């Protein structure tokens, strides 16, 4: 009987230690494309939470009170320069990494000049992503050095995938004869810079209603470049999108710059631009 108790006790200790789950680091990102990237590098060593989720527009996003406690628990925050991040700054106490810091930014772009001095859609460029995933890996190693080998390995794999992605996107758009793109919202400047397109934006930088002068400007752009399609964003209001299509008599092309799987999304954007 003593032997049986001893064996059961020993088994209990082994089982207990064997089932022990390492504590995951809590990592915060501002938008879901970076949730995807952090998870590709961190594997199951981190729990990643995106502040903006779903079809919400980060440019006019307001932080829901229910997220405040989750944000306070973060060990690390990857930020991108969006206006709503200023509110989050007052809540978080963890280390912050600005993923736009080492990027060749497009300054004073057509997107949101009222709030920002550069275009924040930096992830829509494989060249930018190669820089950003290095920053992600380094920051993860700093908070979880025991997983350094895993993070370096996964970062290296992502670098190779981004090289292949860049080649594939270049191949897709190489035969495109229309290099001018009319967009409702100026989200694609980095993609256009990388792959030889020119972005023409309908929306005003302060998100206000189009003036008669703006309408004349857009109509002139359509005539000058023989444009037949307009790129609309999935998170934009359906009424405003439909109004633009009717106003300018254009074929709508629906894209989502904030899709989580940024690799697949860049292929989707390339395919759409090639068919304009």
Curated annotation (Swiss-Prot):
SUPFAM superfamilies: Helical backbone' metal receptor. It comes from the Bacteria. One of its GO terms (biological process) is cell adhesion. GO terms for cellular component: periplasmic space. It is found in: Periplasm. Residues 1-18 form the signal peptide. The keyword Cell division does not apply. A divalent metal cation binds at residues 59, 121, 185, 256. Its main location: periplasm. Keywords: Metal-binding, Periplasm, Signal, Transport. Disulfide bonds: none annotated. GO terms for molecular function: metal ion binding. Belongs to the bacterial solute-binding protein 9 family. Part of an ATP-binding cassette (ABC) transport system involved in metal import. Binds a metal with high affinity and specificity and delivers it to the membrane permease for translocation into the cytoplasm. This is Putative metal-binding protein TC_0696. The lineage of its organism: Bacteria, Pseudomonadati, Chlamydiota, Chlamydiia, Chlamydiales.
């Amino acid at each position: 009987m003593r032997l049986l108790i001893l064996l059961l006790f020993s088994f209990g200790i082994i089982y207990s230690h064997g089932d022990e789950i390492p504590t995951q680091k809590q990592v915060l990102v501002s938008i879901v494309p970076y949730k995807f990237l952090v998870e590709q590098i961190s594997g199951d060593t981190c729990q990643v939470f995106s502040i903006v989720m779903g079809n919400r527009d980060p440019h006019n996003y307001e932080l829901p009170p229910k997220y405040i406690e989750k944000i306070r628990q973060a060990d690390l925050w990857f930020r991108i320069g969006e206006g709503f991040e200023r509110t989050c700054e007052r809540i978080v106490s963890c280390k912050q990494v600005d993923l736009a810091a080492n990027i060749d930014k497009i300054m004073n772009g057509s997107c949101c000049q009222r709030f920002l001095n550069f275009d924040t859609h930096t992830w829509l460029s494989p060249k930018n992503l190669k820089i950003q995933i290095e920053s992600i890996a380094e920051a993860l190693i700093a908070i979880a050095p025991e997983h350094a080998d895993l993070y370096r390995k996964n970062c290296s794999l992502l670098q190779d995938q981004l090289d292949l992605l860049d080649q594939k996107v270049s191949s897709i758009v190489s035969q495109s004869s229309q290099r001018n793109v009319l967009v409702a919202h100026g989200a694609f400047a980095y993609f256009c810079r990388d792959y030889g397109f020119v972005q023409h934006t309908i929306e005003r930088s302060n998100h206000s209603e189009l003036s008669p002068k703006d309408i004349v400007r857009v109509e002139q752009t359509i005539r000058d470049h023989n444009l037949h399609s307009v790129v609309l964003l999935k998170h934009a209001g359906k009424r405003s999108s439909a109004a633009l299509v009717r106003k300018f008599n254009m074929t709508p092309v629906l894209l989502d710059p904030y899709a989580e799987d940024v690799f697949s999304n860049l292929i989707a954007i390339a395919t759409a631009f090639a068919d304009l």
